[in-house]
């Protein structure tokens, strides 16, 4: 063969390779186009406005339930976005090929800026190392020791609400109370720090910063999308100076909030470090008496081998991470439970009787409280039907094939048993779609029925399990990045309900409650109010006197 031909041959080979690449990309994109889903609302923004709108709950339900376990919506300029609730596909994305399907760059950049290099902001080896150290800290063994802290907080909440309703039933914003309760529970149980005396209507600096974080971020929603491009621009002092003099007040507010959270976390950390160095007696004098998550974590880190130890900066970052991840999620779920119990007074009374019969108000050991069947059913059913986080995004870092448990019929009638997904495709993990599928949970799957947990679950659920860490549900996600605090959260909810239902009754008011779409769903009175709240009529429960 003549060597003169080599450049020509290389050129042809290169052109064929590019052609094959483009063909593969085109064919995979056209596979995505063939997936059923609602038509785009706009040529420019596809279905994005409908999906992210505050009142987008009906649209999200439509996509979750009316097109099958895999559906498609449209992003910018009609770019396909996959909505996935198929069990095998979820297993592949979140467990089997977790390294391929990553959180978006924008997510990592944002969480890093807000909380530092904690669990939410790290990936790969760094994240694995943090989880290795943290998983045992969240074990049931430690949760058992934490229960007295939870009860202590709830008894204060009980006394505070009693003061407000002692003259007769009152309308009370139970979301606000659940927010204060969840913050104090993660404060004492997570950080060994008290935010709120739970008597007066006051709050502290850290609590205030945390409360304003979500609304402030909501107001700079569009600018936030630039973060991945600018967050490593220049040295840290330069970025801080730009933020300090930024012409938009909301951006300066966001910086103030982050600064406050970081300063407070560092102060709490420093005082814990001193106490740990002084020994057990000093630790016992701290809030949480050394049984809180941060104290256990710091101790575990100091005893870990050098290879497993994580730097101080990463320990401090976990504090804001826990506070952020633990408060809105738990408080909104608790508000939803109370609202459901007000809508279903018979279930409210049955649950109260179960709790009173077990004497769970003052204190109950972890395993006994965990075993109360209706209490467990009410928590699981609320987390199933009303997951606070309805969906989360993942993006494959390479072209890949997504296998399915059941075939999807394309819009052109083609039957697909797997889907070719191009690199960079946005995938929405269908938490709501998976938790509520009729094919899995039966014809009444959309209804809130805690009793369904009192008998064995249908075979359609147990024989085709989803990878979720909790109860055949996707509410706390799955795999390496699943919620680390789900047991903590479940125990919080059970102690809150044990104490509140032993003392109070909850009824609906005549105000219309709307649940809004956001990172975590939240209630308002009507669809126009900007104030997150759940007013309920709260009265004292008169316990029957013993004969
Ligand atoms: C009802 C309450 C809760 C819900 C619905 C919930 C839900 C979730 C979900 C869906 C994720 C996955 C996020 C993602 O993949 O991007 C997550 C992660 C996380 N959650 Fe929760 N959560 C709750 C309560 C808590 C509590 C009480 C804590 C702490 C005590 C906590 C700490 C975390 C942390 C640290 C992560 C990040 C885990 C990692 O990336 O390794 N969560 N949570």
UniProtKB/Swiss-Prot annotation:
Residues annotated as binding heme are: 483
This protein's UniProt keywords: Glycoprotein, Heme, Iron, Membrane, Metal-binding, Monooxygenase, Oxidoreductase, Transmembrane, Transmembrane helix
InterPro entries noted in UniProt: Cyt_P450, Cyt_P450_E_grp-I, Cyt_P450_sf, Cytochrome_P450_monoxygenase
The prosthetic group or cofactor this protein requires is: heme
- Which residue positions does the secretion signal occupy? none
- Report the pathway entry: Secondary metabolite biosynthesis
- Give the EC number(s) under which this enzyme is classified: 1.-.-.-
- What's a single GO MF annotation on this record? oxidoreductase activity, acting on paired donors, with incorporation or reduction of molecular oxygen
Its placement in the membrane is given as:
Multi-pass membrane protein
Give yes or no: UniProt keyword Transmembrane: yes
Q: Which SUPFAM superfamilies match?
A: Cytochrome P450 (SSF48264)
Q: Which Pfam families match?
A: p450
Q: Name one GO cellular component term.
A: membrane
Quote the subcellular location field of this record: Membrane
Q: What does this protein do?
A: Cytochrome P450 monooxygenase that is able to use dehydroabietic acid as a substrate for oxidation.
Q: Which PANTHER family match?
A: CYTOCHROME P450, CYTOCHROME P450 12A4, MITOCHONDRIAL-RELATED
Q: What is this protein called?
A: Cytochrome P450 monooxygenase 81
Source species, please?
A: Postia placenta (strain ATCC 44394 / Madison 698-R) (Brown rot fungus)
The gene for this chain is CYP081
């Amino acid at each position: 063969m003549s060597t003169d031909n080599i450049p020509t041959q290389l050129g042809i080979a290169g052109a064929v390779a590019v052609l094959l690449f483009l063909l593969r990309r085109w064919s995979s994109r056209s596979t995505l186009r063939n997936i059923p889903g609602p038509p785009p609302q706009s040529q420019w923004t596809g279905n994005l406005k409908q999906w992210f709108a505050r009142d987008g709950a009906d649209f999200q339900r439509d996509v979750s339930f009316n097109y099958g376990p895999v559906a498609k919506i449209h992003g910018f300029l009609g770019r396909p976005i996959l909505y996935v609730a198929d069990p095998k596909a979820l297993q592949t994305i979140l467990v089997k090929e977790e390294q391929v399907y990553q959180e978006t760059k924008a997510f990592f950049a944002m969480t890093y800026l807000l909380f530092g290099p904690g669990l939410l902001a790290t990936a790969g080896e760094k994240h694995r190392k943090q989880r290795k150290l943290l998983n045992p800290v969240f074990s049931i063994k430690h949760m058992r020791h934490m229960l007295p802290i939870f009860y202590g907080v709830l008894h204060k909440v009980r006394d505070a609400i009693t003061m407000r309703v002692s003259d007769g039933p009152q309308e009370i914003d139970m979301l606000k109370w659940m927010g204060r309760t969840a913050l104090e529970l993660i404060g004492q149980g997570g950080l060994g720090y008290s935010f709120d005396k739970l008597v007066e209507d006051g709050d502290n600096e850290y609590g205030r910063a945390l409360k304003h974080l979500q609304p402030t971020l909501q107001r700079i929603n569009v600018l936030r999308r630039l973060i991945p491009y600018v967050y490593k621009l220049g040295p840290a002092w330069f970025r801080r100076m730009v933020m300090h003099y930024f012409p938009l007040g909301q951006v300066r507010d966001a910086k103030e909030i982050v600064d406050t959270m970081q300063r407070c976390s560092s102060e709490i950390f420093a005082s814990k470090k001193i106490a740990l160095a002084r020994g057990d007696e000093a630790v016992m004098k701290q809030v949480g008496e050394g049984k809180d998550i941060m104290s256990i974590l710091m101790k575990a880190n100091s005893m870990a081998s050098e290879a497993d130890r994580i730097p101080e900066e990463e320990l401090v970052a976990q504090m804001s991470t826990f506070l952020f991840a633990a408060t809105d999620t738990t408080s909104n779920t608790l508000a939803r439970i109370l609202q459901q119990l007000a809508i279903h007074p018979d279930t409210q009374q049955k649950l109260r009787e179960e709790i009173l019969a077990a004497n769970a108000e003052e204190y109950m050991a972890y395993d006994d409280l965990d075993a109360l069947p209706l209490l467990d059913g009410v928590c699981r059913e609320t987390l199933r039907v009303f997951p606070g986080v309805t969906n989360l995004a993942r993006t494959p870092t390479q072209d890949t094939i997504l296998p399915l448990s059941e075939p999807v019929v394309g819009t052109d009638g083609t039957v697909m048993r797997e889907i070719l997904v191009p690199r960079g495709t946005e995938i929405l993990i269908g938490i709501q779609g998976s938790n509520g599928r009729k094919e899995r949970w039966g014809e009444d799957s959309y209804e809130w029925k805690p009793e369904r947990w009192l008998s064995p679950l249908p075979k359609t659920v147990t024989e085709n399990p989803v990878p979720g860490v909790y109860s055949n549900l996707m509410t706390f996600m799955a795999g390496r990045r699943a919620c680390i605090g789900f047991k903590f959260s479940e125990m919080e909810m059970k102690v809150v309900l044990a104490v509140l239902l032993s003392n109070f009754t909850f009824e609906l008011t005549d105000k219309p409650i709307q649940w809004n779409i956001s990172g975590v769903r939240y209630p308002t009175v009507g669809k126009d109010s900007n104030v997150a709240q759940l007013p309920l009529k709260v009265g004292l429960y008169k316990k029957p006197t013993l004969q």
